[in-house]
UniProtKB/Swiss-Prot annotation:
Plays a complex role in regulating the basal catalytic activity of the alpha subunit. The tetrameric holoenzyme CK2, composed of two alpha and two beta subunits, phosphorylates the transcription factor PIF1 after an exposure to light, resulting in a proteasome-dependent degradation of PIF1 and promotion of photomorphogenesis. CK2 phosphorylates translation initiation factors. May participate in the regulation of the initiation of translation. The lineage of its organism: Eukaryota, Viridiplantae, Streptophyta, Embryophyta, Tracheophyta. This is Putative casein kinase II subunit beta-4. Residues 1-23, 35-92 are annotated as: Disordered. Residues 58-70 have a biased composition (Polar residues). Its main location: cytoplasm.
């Protein structure tokens, strides 16, 4: 399972560098374009887009994972530095969930408990929203399969993007639970979601929020509990994440659950002046 997450072991002689591998793995625009194309062709109510005949042509999720990291990127990743795109442990036994949450740009995501994902009740209704649902779920849970056929490039991209979409839709539910909020609390305390850019909020820690609960409607924003306004994330990588993976409810329910974490509103507002005189505000 993801034996090549550390950047080697699948390529044989000379494996690609970690940044090169991830440059291809997180090329969301290319992958999402492929998924959009597929969603237009298929019925949105279909939970599994393969017939029994089609299933024989699709390999196991473990094969998909190997190809995900062994495939060379079409273009170089757009990075600000030459540092690694992944933080934390990169051992061979890293789960897909840990690997995904540690990708550059995915810092807003917390790790969803596998027990939560394995409970069918928590996934109610998602099979009709995500194409290749069963394969995407197997990929997330690192489930091995005896099917040894190979993905086509298009099928590989579909399952890869479907797994990201499915995890996001599970994530938005999980962060409304007690365990999910506790995980997000740690990130909030560590300023993982960023600080409010407003001067008079004095670097207030923010929370992720979506402007819509419908997937692919808008990207994630950050909500400042002090000035109660929303802003674009500072990182362009985080700015590409679907806002539906965090939803419109989370920050407000979070602050109700942790009332002691809600800051007082700023006492000062900026006042425009010209040569020291306040500018008259015409109504």
């Amino acid at each position: 399972m993801y034996k090549d997450r550390s950047g080697g072991g699948i390529m044989g002689g000379g494996g690609s560098s970690r940044s090169e591998i991830l440059g291809g793995a997180i090329d969301r625009k290319r992958i999402n374009d492929a998924l959009d194309k597929h969603l237009k062709k298929s019925s949105p109510s279909t939970s599994r887009v393969f017939t029994s005949k089609d299933k024989d042509s699709v390999p196991s999720t473990s094969t998909a994972k190997s190809q995900l990291h062994s495939r060379s990127p079409d273009v170089e990743s757009d990075t600000d530095s030459e540092g690694s795109d992944v933080s934390g442990s990169e051992g061979d036994d890293t789960s897909w969930i840990s690997w995904f949450c540690n990708l550059r740009g995915n810092e807003f995501f917390c790790e969803v408990d596998e027990d939560y994902i394995q409970d069918d009740f928590n996934l109610c209704g998602l099979s009709g929203q995500v194409p290749y649902y069963d394969y995407a779920l197997d990929l997330i849970l690192d489930v091995e399969s005896s099917n040894g056929d190979m993905f086509t490039e298009e099928q590989h991209e579909m399952v890869e993007s479907a797994a990201e979409m499915l995890y996001g839709l599970i994530h938005v539910r999980y962060i409304l639970t007690t365990k999910g909020m506790a995980a997000m609390m740690e990130k909030y305390k560590n300023y993982d979601f960023g600080r409010c850019p407003r001067v008079f909020c004095c670097g207030q820690s923010c929370l992720p929020v979506g402007q819509s609960d419908i997937p692919r409607s808008s990207t994630v924003k950050i909500y400042c509990p002090k000035c109660e306004d929303i802003y674009y994330p500072r990182s362009k990588y985080q700015g590409n994440i679907d806002g539906a993976y965090f939803g419109t409810t989370f920050p407000h329910l979070f602050l109700m659950a942790y009332g002691n974490m809600k800051p007082q509103k700023p006492a000062q507002n900026y006042v425009p002046k010209i040569f020291g005189f306040k500018v008259h505000n015409k109504q």
